Amino acid sequence: MGNLAVNMDTKTDTNTDTMADTSPASTMTTSTDISLQLNEIVQEYANADGPVTRVIDGISLSFDKPTINMLLGPSGCGKSTLLHMMGGVRPFGVQSPTSGSVHINGEVCDGPHDDAVMVFQRYANRPDLTVYENVAFPFRLGLWKKKFPEAEWKKRVDDMLEAVGLTDKKNLSSAQLSGGQNQRVALARALVLRPRILLMDEPFGALDAQTREEMQQLLITLHKTSPCLIVFVTHDVTEALLLGDRVIVLSTQPAKIADDFEITESRPRSAVWQRSTEAVTMQERVLSQLHKFSAGRGTLRVTI
């Protein structure tokens, strides 16, 4: 749609280690009506001394509800590549996808889209800005600044800081925060835009177990109060079953869909349910697929 992906340095950028905000070439709404479709996605990379390497092989997916969708697969299988395509983030100098298409609300997504915001494991908060300024950062950008009256965006920022429990730290530098608090800032900065699609690339992967659990519960709460379509990449099978309405497992390269199933248990999911036959069977189902593809390719995580 001709929009810009921007990082926290306000440069036009598609660096996949930063959070990609988008500029509003068209009006973003808070409606839960959303359609995200991937049609026969193929991704190949050229090799200097041989044939191309195919990393994604004909993947088709459809999302049309404000649900949490967990994406798992062996390390290096193409999960992040697929997620970035959904957000319109393209690697420099590479056609992506090689073939196939991504559609948001029926329109081809060939660049960063108004309705999609990304959050990465590296939260990319600026240490020279306060917590408040980091969350408000999108509204410093020209188009967002013109779109929202100052009183409106300030209220959004205040409300989001309260929602993530950082009101009392809004005047601190992000350098003074813990890893979990910084990830709260990154999540708040994404949600302050009220996106209809939130794309999360292992956002809690670097956190300690207690902080990760706190962030998982926070995400559940925020999704309940502000529903949106979430696609969440993780290596943690337990996390997938705790958060997901749908679990999608990719094979090793070239990646195909190895499994795709829904979880009907309501959130928050109790410890009793997590030990139930239903949950254990799902866990074994996912692990059997991952172990089949993951020998020697990386670490699977099951938290207890």
At which residue positions do the language-model features occur?
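Conserved ABC ATPase "signature" region
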Residues: 140, 148-169, 221
